[in-house]
Amino acid sequence: MVDFAFELRKVQDTGKLVMGAKKSIHYAKVGGAKMIIVAKNARPDIKEDIYYYAKLSGIPVYEFEGTSVELGTLLGRPHTVSALAVIDPGESRILALAGGKE
C-alpha cells in the first residue's frame, strides 16, 4: 500500500508539483500533469472543473481524504491547498494512488 504523505513529500523532494486550484485546473485543461490531487473539502465548483477537464485530458484525479488545511500542512505550507497538480512524480510512487502509470 502506498503511503500518501510519504509519497507526497517524495514528489516535493525529487519531482515537481504546482499548488493551487487555478493552476491545477489549467494543467487539467492543457494536459501536462501526470496526476491531480484535490482535497475532500474543496469547493464543489473547483472539484467539478478539475474532474471534468482531467477526464477530457486523461489525467487521473486522487481525492485526498483530508481537508485543504491538512493538505497544506503535509506540504509544509502555512495556508490551505485545495488542489495540486503533479507534473513530475520524481522517485515517488504517488501515481499508483489514482491508478496512473508509475
Swiss-Prot record:
Q: Which family does it belong to?
A: Belongs to the eukaryotic ribosomal protein eL30 family.
- In the record, what terms sit under GO molecular function? RNA binding; structural constituent of ribosome
Q: Which GO terms describe its biological process?
A: translation
**Which Gene Ontology cellular component terms are annotated?**
cytosolic large ribosomal subunit
Where do the TM regions start and end?
none
Instruction: Name the SUPFAM superfamilies on file.
Output: L30e-like
Question: Source organism's superkingdom?
Answer: Archaea
The protein's name in its UniProt record: Large ribosomal subunit protein eL30
| Natural source organism | Thermococcus gammatolerans (strain DSM 15229 / JCM 11827 / EJ3)
Q: Which PANTHER family match?
A: RIBOSOMAL PROTEIN L30
For this UniProt record, give its keywords in alphabetical order, as a comma-separated list: Ribonucleoprotein, Ribosomal protein
